[in-house]
C-alpha cells in the first residue's frame, strides 16, 4: 500500500504532533497566495509522544480536539507528519523507466533500500527526474513508514472525528513551506530543532539532497539547566529561551549551552560535509532554523560562528496574508519557527 507523501489537491489543516506540543495551522489559498486562518498549540504531558510514537493516544487526541474547538476549526480533513526511527527517507539512483515500471520496480525491490520488512511499511516515492541527454539514470526519493506507527496516528485522529488525507514527513513539510517563501535557486540547510529530535534537510536546485533525523533536541538543554539549579521545568525553559534573566547563573548556563549546542552543531556539520562532498561545485548559501529549539538564546550567533555560514530564523508566514484583527503580525513572526512544520503540512493539498 502507498501513502500520499507526494500528492496534490485541496488544502488540509496541518497538525504537527511533537513530543512537547501539538501545533495546528489552517490556511486558505487565494489568487494572491495563502492566508493564515488559524494557528495554535497546546503542550502535551511529558511522555505522551516519544520519538514519533504515540504512547498516550487518548491524551493526544483530547488535546487536538480541544485545540480545534478553541480555534473554532470546522474542517475535518487534516494532515500530519512523521519523523524519527519509524520513517526512512532515501535517495536511490535508478535507470530511467516509465512510471508504471518504476512503481513496479520500487515495490518489488524496496527491501534492498530500506532496513524494514516490506510487509511492515507503507511505501511512496517520487522520481526527481535528474536524468539528462548524457545520463539515462535518475534519482528517486523513496519513503518508507512503519505501518504500526502510522496506523496509530490514523486511528487516534479518526477517534476524534478527523480524517487524515495527508501523511507527510517532517523534512518534506519544512521544504514545502520554505519553497513557498524563498526562490528555488538557493542551496540551503533547513534545520528544525524540536524538543526531542532535530531534522536536517538540505535543498539544492529545488530538491532535497540530504535528509536526516537525529535524536537530539531542545529538551536536553532545558533538563540540563533544570538539574543544574534544581528548579522547575518552566523556569529552566525560560532561562533557555532568555525570557527569564540568568543573573548570577549566567556563566553556568553558558557552559551548559556550549556542551549541548556543540553536539547539535556537530550533527549539522556532518550533514553539511556530506552535502559538500557530493556537491563540491554548489556551496551552501545559508542555514535556516525552525522549531521551538531554534529560539534558544544565542543559538543563531553560535551556529554562525561555528559554521561560517549565514544563519536565520525561519518565519513561514512572512509572505502570507492574515486578518490583522484576529492574528497579530508580530505574533505570527514570534511563533513562526515552531509553526514551520504545521504550516508546511497545511500548504499541502489533500488527495481526497
What is each model feature region?
Residues 81-180, 286, 316-323, 338-341, ...:
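Active-site neighborhood for divalent-cation/phosphate handling
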Residues 19, 25-36, 80, 135-235:
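Small-residue (GG/TT-enriched) beta-loop-alpha framework at ligand/catalytic clefts
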Residues 72, 152, 194-205, 333-352:
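Extended, charge-rich low-complexity interaction segments
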Residues 227, 238-286, 293:
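Adenine-nucleotide phosphate-binding core of ATP-dependent small-molecule kinases
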Residues 1-109, 151-153, 159, 163:
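Non-catalytic, solvent-exposed interaction/assembly segments
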Residues 64-77, 160, 231, 269-286:
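Phosphate/pyrophosphate-binding loops at sites that engage ATP/ADP/AMP, CoA/4′-phosphopantetheine
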Amino acid at each position: 500500500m502507498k501513502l500520499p507523501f507526494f500528492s496534490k489537491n485541496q488544502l488540509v489543516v496541518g497538525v504537527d504532533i511533537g513530543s512537547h506540543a501539538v501545533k495546528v495551522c489552517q490556511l486558505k489559498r487565494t489568487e494572491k497566495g495563502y492566508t493564515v486562518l488559524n494557528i495554535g498549540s497546546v503542550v502535551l504531558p511529558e511522555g505522551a509522544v516519544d520519538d514519533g510514537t504515540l504512547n498516550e493516544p487518548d491524551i493526544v487526541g483530547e488535546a487536538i480536539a480541544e485545540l480545534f474547538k478553541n480555534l473554532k476549526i470546522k474542517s475535518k480533513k487534516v494532515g500530519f507528519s512523521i519523523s524519527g526511527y519509524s520513517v526512512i527517507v532515501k535517495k536511490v539512483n535508478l535507470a530511467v523507466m516509465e512510471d508504471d515500471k518504476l512503481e513496479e520496480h520500487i515495490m518489488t525491490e524496496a527491501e534492498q533500500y530500506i532496513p524494514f520488512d516490506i510487509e511492515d511499511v507503507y511505501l511512496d516515492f517520487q522520481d526527481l527526474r535528474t536524468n539528462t541527454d548524457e545520463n539515462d539514470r535518475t534519482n528517486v526519493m523513496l519513503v518508507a513508514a512503519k505501518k504500526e506507527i502510522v496506523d496509530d496516528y490514523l486511528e487516534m485522529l479518526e477517534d476524534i472525528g478527523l480524517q487524515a488525507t495527508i501523511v507527510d514527513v517532517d523534512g518534506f513539510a519544512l521544504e514545502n513551506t520554505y519553497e513557498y517563501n524563498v526562490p528555488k535557486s538557493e542551496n540551503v540547510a533547513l534545520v528544525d530543532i524540536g524538543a526531542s529530535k532535530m531534522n536536517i534537510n538540505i535543498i539544492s536546485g529545488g530538491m532535497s539532497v540530504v535528509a536526516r533525523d537525529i535524536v537530539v533536541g531542545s529538551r536536553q538543554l532545558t533538563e540540563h539547566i533544570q538539574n543544574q539549579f534544581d528548579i522547575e521545568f518552566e523556569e529552566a525553559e525560560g532561562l533557555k529561551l532568555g525570557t527569564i534573566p540568568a543573573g548570577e547563573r549566567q556563566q553556568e548556563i553558558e557552559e551548559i549551552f556550549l556542551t549541548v549546542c556543540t553536539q547539535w552543531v556537530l550533527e549539522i556539520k556532518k550533514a553539511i560535509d556530506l552535502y559538500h562532498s557530493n556537491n563540491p561545485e554548489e556551496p551552501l548559501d545559508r542555514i535556516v532554523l525552525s522549531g521551538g529549539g531554534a529560539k534558544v538564546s544565542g543559538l543563531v550567533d553560535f551556529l554562525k560562528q561555528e559554521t561560517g555560514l549565514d544563519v536565520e530564523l525561519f518565519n513561514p508566514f512572512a509572505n502570507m496574508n492574515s486578518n490583522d484583527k484576529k492574528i497579530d503580525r508580530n505574533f505570527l513572526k514570534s511563533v513562526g519557527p515552531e509553526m514551520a512544520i504545521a504550516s508546511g503540512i497545511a500548504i499541502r493539498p489533500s488527495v481526497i
